């Protein structure tokens, strides 16, 4: 059967709407499904061009953490400006920062409605280094399509997902269907912690004013289980130094008479979490909000096998705060972890010493409503309060960020939910993630608006690793989902 071209789909839509114009429910059904045919037809007709434009970005090694790629960062920013203008942006420019530049673009809808929403699309054009190169099965800077997946650095994170946003925008603008104002802000330092972003947001707060922020830089639960990320955990991180004697001592001459810094450190850290998995820092849970029952019910719908989870990481059982499931504990509840610990002699053979110093790096994953600076100070105070005599303890905060939760009853979330349902054929689950993206809380604190995380990654995509890839079927469905998001948000379904 010959594939319906775009003009043919438009004609079919007009004919069917004419036939069913007297039946509102039938009209809605026809409108919805013909619109889906039209966007998928457009994607198919322009697929080769889309892939080549995507490839033109991937071929630029925009590795933000390596000074040797400084010129590549600028080249990538310029290429994004070109692509945004070609897609229909009325303005696109490179804006400097203390680090790598930002790309800013905008589109103002031509409509008589003064109350149309303004969407700010955020992405990043920098990528992680590709090393170790010998583990790649193809050139990381030259896209290679194998078995329905595109392999390259940035295939997913985040050049591939950014292209989803831009191609959905292109379709709507080219066909007179974009009834939202749209602004784009692409940064070049996300992979190094976005050191310039907060300053940029504050300096250009008026320029970036919007009603909602849209980000595609997260993942779905699975290809058959679409989901919207509705929450991220915050982070607090410290280094602890414990100092005892002025030098490493002979454990036979001094053991039992002088406090061992490593013993002291492990004693203190062992007190931070009790046998029920509760964190014992005074006041730690004061700002922790309960998980809404509606969300707990949604979490139960997520396909999850405790046995398979344990087998995948080769442990006998899970552990955590009593009264919560594993999925609740690693996404909606705070946690404490010792990330590294060292001191004394760790070389070959044995050396009987009582070490003079001990160190640990520790972190807390926080949840929305917890302030990372407040928690950071509370932890430092607690450690000092339980420090034993005979050692000196220093707690140094490293970095941190706020958690984030997106309400699932706001219009923008409902629009995203609709987009996923149309594109993937089923209602997406609302799913919090255990990781942290500090920039999301920066958006809320500085710009005063919520963020919708419409991510289309999969665990299999191996972001940050050799052989990063993107499922092309999911990628195309992502374009459909974002297209439908805009239509739903502007009320033009």
Regions found by a protein language model. Give the residues of each.
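Acidic, glycine-rich active-site loops and adjacent beta-strand->loop/helix elements
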Residues: 125-127, 185-194, 216-220, 244-246, ...
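Cationic, low-complexity basic patches in intrinsically disordered or flexible, solvent-exposed regions
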Residues: 3-4, 14, 33
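Acidic/histidine-rich catalytic neighborhood of metal-dependent amide-processing enzymes
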Residues: 150, 156-231, 490-493
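N-terminal helical capping/dimerization or prosegment-like subdomains
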Residues: 35-133, 357, 361, 374
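A short core secondary-structure module
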Residues: 255-276
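Active-site metal-coordination/substrate-binding segment of hydrolases
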Residues: 114-186, 477
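An extended, acidic, His-containing surface patch that forms the Zn2+-binding/catalytic region
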Residues: 222-223, 280-357, 365-381, 386, ...
């Amino acid at each position: 059967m010959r594939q319906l071209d775009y003009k043919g789909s438009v004609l079919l839509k007009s004919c069917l709407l004419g036939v069913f114009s007297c039946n509102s429910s039938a009209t809605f059904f026809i409108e919805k499904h013909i619109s889906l045919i039209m966007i998928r037809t457009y994607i198919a007709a322009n697929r080769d061009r889309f892939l080549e434009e995507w490839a033109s970005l991937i071929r630029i090694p925009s590795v933000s953490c390596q000074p040797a790629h400084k010129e590549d960062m600028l080249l990538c920013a310029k290429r994004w400006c070109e692509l945004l203008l070609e897609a229909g942006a009325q303005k696109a420019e490179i804006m400097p920062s203390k680090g790598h530049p930002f790309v800013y673009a905008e589109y103002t809808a031509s409509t008589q409605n003064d109350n149309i929403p303004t969407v700010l699309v955020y992405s990043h054009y920098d990528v992680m280094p590709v090393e170790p190169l010998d583990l790649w099965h193809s050139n990381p800077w030259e896209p290679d399509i194998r078995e329905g997946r595109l392999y390259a650095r940035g295939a997913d994170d985040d050049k591939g997902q950014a292209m989803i946003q831009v191609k959905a925008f292109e379709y709507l603008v080219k066909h007179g269907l974009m009834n939202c104002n749209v602004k784009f802000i692409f940064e070049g330092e996300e992979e190094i912690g976005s050191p310039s972003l907060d300053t940029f947001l504050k300096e250009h707060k008026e320029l970036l004013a919007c009603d909602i922020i849209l980000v595609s830089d997260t993942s779905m639960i699975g290809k058959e289980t679409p989901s919207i990320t509705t929450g991220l955990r915050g982070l607090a991180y410290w280094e602890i130094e414990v100092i005892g004697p002025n030098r490493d001592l002979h454990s036979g001459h001094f053991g039992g008479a002088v406090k061992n810094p490593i013993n002291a450190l492990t004693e203190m850290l062992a007190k931070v979490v009790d046998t029920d998995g509760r964190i014992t820092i005074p006041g730690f849970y004061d700002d922790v909000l309960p998980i809404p029952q509606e969300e707990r019910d949604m979490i139960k719908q997520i396909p999850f096998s405790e046995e398979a989870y344990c087998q995948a990481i080769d442990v006998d059982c899970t552990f955590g705060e009593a009264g919560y499931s594993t999925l609740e504990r690693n996404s909606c509840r705070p946690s404490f972890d010792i990330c590294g610990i060292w001191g004394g002699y760790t070389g070959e053979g044995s050396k009987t010493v009582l070490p003079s110093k001990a160190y640990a790096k520790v972190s807390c994953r926080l949840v929305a409503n917890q302030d990372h600076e407040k928690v950071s100070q509370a932890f430092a105070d607690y450690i000092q309060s339980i420090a034993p005599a005979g050692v000196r303890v220093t707690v140094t905060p490293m970095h941190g960020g706020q958690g984030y939760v997106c309400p699932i009853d706001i219009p923008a979330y409902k629009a995203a939910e609709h987009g996923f349902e149309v594109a993937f054929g089923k209602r997406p689950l609302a799913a919090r993630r255990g990781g942290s993206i500090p920039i999301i809380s920066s958006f809320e604190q500085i710009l005063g608006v919520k963020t919708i995380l419409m991510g289309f990654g999969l665990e299999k995509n191996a972001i940050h690793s050799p052989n990063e890839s993107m499922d092309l079927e999911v990628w195309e469905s992502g374009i459909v989902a974002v297209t439908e998001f805009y239509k739903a948000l502007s009320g033009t379904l």
